[in-house]
Design a protein with these regions (language model features):
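Terminal low-complexity/charged segments
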Residues: 1-134
Length: 134
């Protein structure tokens, strides 16, 4: 099985940096070489909507409780919501992460972009109390 693209001349990361500016993201290395970027909650829907053209599949969406994690990424806060996107035809994937505080564990819903997000968002709400608005 061929591994997904990481960074190429026309990478999704380069595309995002060109569209939103590199300062809008915090890159995170990953063990599986999947490009992983942290983005603010305020920019999330714009970024996900832009990525939808290139990544038609929301492979996974999940919440993480980071409060007791000892070796967490610098960008993490109390909770993290992770969006794992896939482009089967282009054999590439990307992860987008959003850090949330315990005082305000809310993020806009991605269900209008990928309808299957609704199911994943319900699970994150049930497990961690993360609210998905919209």
């Amino acid at each position: 099985m061929q591994q997904a693209q990481v960074l190429s001349k026309d990478s999704a990361v380069d595309d995002l940096f060109a569209r939103f500016g590199a300062a809008a993201f915090v890159p995170q290395p990953s063990a599986d070489n999947t490009p992983t970027l942290w983005v603010s909650r305020e920019r999330l829907l714009d970024v996900l909507s832009h990525l939808k053209r290139r990544f038609p599949m929301l492979l996974d969406l999940f919440g993480m409780d980071e409060r007791l994690r000892e070796h967490r990424p610098a960008a993490a806060r109390d909770f993290t919501v992770v969006y794992h996107l896939l482009n089967i035809a282009g054999r590439e994937e990307i992860r987008i992460k959003v850090a949330l505080s315990d005082a305000d564990p809310a993020v806009p819903s991605a269900a209008q972009i990928w309808p299957n997000a609704n199911w994943y968002e319900r699970e994150a709400w049930d497990m961690y109390g993360i609210n998905f608005s919209g």
